[in-house]
Amino acid sequence: MRAPKAALLFGLLPPHAGFDEQDVLVEAATVSQALRELGHPTVEVPITLDLRQAARRLARLAPPFVFNLVESIEGRDRLVHLAPALLDSLGLRYTGSPTEAIFLTSSKLLTKERLRAAGIPTPAWAGLREGSAPEPGFPPPYIVKSVWEHASIGLTGSAVAHDGQSLAEELRRRTGRGPSRALFVEAYIEGREFNLALLEGPNHRAQVLPPAEIEFQSFPPGKPRIVDYAAKWESDSPEFTQTPRRFDFP
């Protein structure tokens, strides 16, 4: 009798998917290989907003566990919590954070509110109302970010604005580009950038993996030191080649 297959759950890629979306296929292949080496056969389960179809397939497969790789559903990052919610409804075990945690942290605004409530410093910010002029209520420089989307989608050097006029221009450039393009303005703070990864350890305590620092090599004066879309995904761009990670730093 063959062992049941662990399910690799991820969002079905749309036609002409960007580099950021295609990355999930690399993740799925890497996870699948690791699980097979540990003796767990796998099956890929791409999902769409037709959650009933996904539920029927998962029910037929009856996987011993699900590796949740869903970061977006049909291009809507704000719906990412639907994946663990579906798995909860089916009573399936899965990797990663639970539904409530993903729901509360997929919105950067909700995350910042919870950080502030917990006494953790976070830069000043202002939400934006459709059709109203931006009035952050704090001095520049500013950085314009997506409320819901991750992976630096839409983020370029022009996201950093040093006055009200450039802020308004950046908002005009990015407003209305897709279903999840809600934006907010945050105080831009120049400084070093680190990547910190956490795993759940024994007794549900967080285990912090070794930190990595992003270097900004040969950035000309005035160029914002941010990890924008090009730095993350466009491997032939100067931003990509000039932002290596290092693990040995003072």
Please state what every model-predicted region is:
Residues 1-93, 99-100, 104-106, 110, ...:
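ATP-binding N-terminal substructure of ATP-dependent carboxylate-amine bond-forming enzymes
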Residues 2-11, 29, 58-62, 102-193, ...:
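Active-site nucleotide/adenylate-binding loops and adjacent lid/helix of ATP-dependent enzymes
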Residues 41-43, 93, 121-124, 207:
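Conserved beta-strand segments of alpha/beta enzyme cores
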Residues 45, 128, 161, 211, ...:
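Hydrophobic residues at beta-strand termini and immediately following loops
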Residues 70, 127, 146, 212-213:
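Short secondary-structure boundary segments
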Residues 95-97, 151-154, 240-242:
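Short small-residue beta-strand/loop micro-motif enriched in glycine and branched aliphatics
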Residues 164-250:
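Phosphate-binding site of ATP-dependent enzymes
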